[in-house]
């Protein structure tokens, strides 16, 4: 199931050239992912309070068009894989005024016990409802 996160570009996200700085695209993806998590599973703060974190293993993407200050955009994302504790996402960032695809990327993460930064191998057993919901959300 694809999911959308919408907002406008903020001034501090742009660089001297007047476009969103490349480092901020990962922040936009994180904002979208945190909203997705809260809307579909559990808020990240509740997850952390239960002793679980979600480190990023990899992220990559292509910059296809520019976003500028105050441009409205949406991040269209989907969970493309979930293997027990490891998960992968695909993203598209689209300027909603022009409908231009501005960025296309992927990221990989995993559930870990807070402080360990190692895969939470008993995640399925310890969080069966969350595991079940996560499995149902996968859209390859």
Where are the predicted features?
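Hydrophobic beta-strand-centered segment that forms part of the acyl-chain substrate-binding groove
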Residues: 36-87
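Solvent-exposed, charged/polar functional surfaces in cytosolic regulatory/catalytic domains
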Residues: 35, 62, 129-133
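Generic structural detector for well-ordered beta-strands
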Residues: 6-10, 62, 110
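Catalytic strand-loop segment that frames the active site of acyl-thioester-processing enzymes
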Residues: 1-36
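A broad, structural micro-motif
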Residues: 20, 54-56, 102
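HotDog/MaoC-like acyl-thioester-processing domains
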Residues: 1-5, 68-69, 80-140
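Glycine-rich, flexible loop/turn motifs
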Residues: 8-10, 15-16, 43, 50, ...
């Amino acid at each position: 199931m694809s999911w959308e996160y919408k907002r406008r570009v903020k001034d501090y996200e742009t660089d001297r050239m007047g476009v969103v700085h490349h480092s901020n695209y990962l922040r936009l993806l994180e904002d979208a992912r945190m909203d997705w998590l809260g809307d579909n599973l559990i808020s990240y703060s509740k997850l952390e309070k239960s002793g679980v974190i979600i480190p990023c293993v990899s992220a990559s993407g292509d910059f296809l068009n520019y976003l500028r200050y105050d441009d409205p955009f949406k991040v269209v994302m989907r969970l493309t894989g979930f293997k027990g504790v490891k998960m992968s996402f695909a993203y598209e960032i689209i300027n909603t005024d022009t409908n231009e695809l501005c960025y296309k990327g992927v990221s990989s993460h995993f559930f870990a016990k807070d402080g360990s930064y190692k895969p939470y191998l008993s995640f399925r057993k310890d969080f069966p409802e969350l595991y079940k919901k996560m499995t149902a959300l996968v859209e390859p």
